[in-house]
Amino acid sequence: MYFITSNEGKFREVREMASKYGIEIEWLKMEYIEPQGSSLEEIARLSAEMLAEKVEGEFVIEDSGLFVEALKGFPGPYSSYVFKTIGNEGILKLMEGVENRKAYFMAVVAYFDGKEVRTFTGKVEGEISREMRGTQGFGYDPIFLYGNKTFAEMATEEKNQVSHRRKAFEEFFRWLKENKI
C-alpha cells in the first residue's frame, strides 16, 4: 500500500507506526493540488477521490491541521498554506499578549481500497508555546506544547506515543487488520 505525501517526515513517522502492525507502507512522493474544503475530513476525502483517478491500487493519505482556540480554530484546514506563508513566527506573532493558549492538532487519514474512501480521525490537545522550542519534527512542532515539552523537543518515538497522526493511523491500522488483512 502506498502512503502519498510529499513530506518525508510524515512518511518516516507513519512507516514506523505501520511496522508495529506488520503493515508495509511504501512512499509515493507526489505533489498534488489540495482541494479547498471547510474541514480536514472534506479535504482528505476530496484529495483521495482525486488521486484515485491517477494512482492504481490502494493508498492512504493524511491531512492534518493546527487549531488555535483564541484564533477561532485558525489556521485549521488552511494549516499547510499558513505555515508556508507566515510559519511558526506568524502564529506566535498573532498570539502575542493572548492568555488563552489552548490548541489542538487534528489528523484525518483517508484510505482508498480501490473502490471507496474511508476516513479515520485523531486529535491531541495542547497549547501554543510562547517561543519556538526544539529541533525535532517538522511544521508546527516547535510551537505546540504537550505537557511541558513542545513536539519538537520530543524524540520521534515519544511524539508518536501521543500524536494526532498516531491516533488516526492506529485507528486505521486496527480497522485494516480486522477488515482487510
UniProtKB/Swiss-Prot annotation:
Q: Indicate the family of this protein.
A: Belongs to the HAM1 NTPase family.
Which Gene Ontology terms describe the biological processes this protein takes part in? nucleotide metabolic process; purine nucleoside triphosphate catabolic process
Name under which the protein is recorded = dITP/XTP pyrophosphatase
Any GO molecular function: XTP diphosphatase activity
- Tell me which EC number(s) this protein carries: 3.6.1.66
Q: Does the keyword Membrane apply?
A: no
Q: Which reaction does it catalyse?
A: XTP + H2O = XMP + diphosphate + H(+); dITP + H2O = dIMP + diphosphate + H(+); ITP + H2O = IMP + diphosphate + H(+)
**Which residue positions are annotated as catalytic?**
63
What InterPro entries does the annotation carry? dITP/XTP_pyrophosphatase, ITPase-like_fam, RdgB/HAM1
Q: One GO cellular component from the entry?
A: cytoplasm
What does the note accompanying the cofactor annotation read? Binds 1 Mg(2+) ion per subunit.
Q: Which cofactor does it need?
A: Mg(2+)
Positions of substrate binding: 5-10, 64, 138-141, 159, 164-165
Source organism of the structure: Archaeoglobus fulgidus (strain ATCC 49558 / DSM 4304 / JCM 9628 / NBRC 100126 / VC-16)
Please give the function described in this protein's UniProt entry.
Answer: Pyrophosphatase that catalyzes the hydrolysis of nucleoside triphosphates to their monophosphate derivatives, with a high preference for the non-canonical purine nucleotides xanthosine triphosphate (XTP), deoxyinosine triphosphate (dITP) and ITP. Probably functions as a house-cleaning enzyme that removes non-canonical purine nucleotides from the nucleotide pool, thus preventing their incorporation into DNA/RNA and avoiding chromosomal lesions. Shows very low activity on dGTP or dUTP, and has nearly no activity toward the canonical nucleotides ATP, CTP, and TTP.
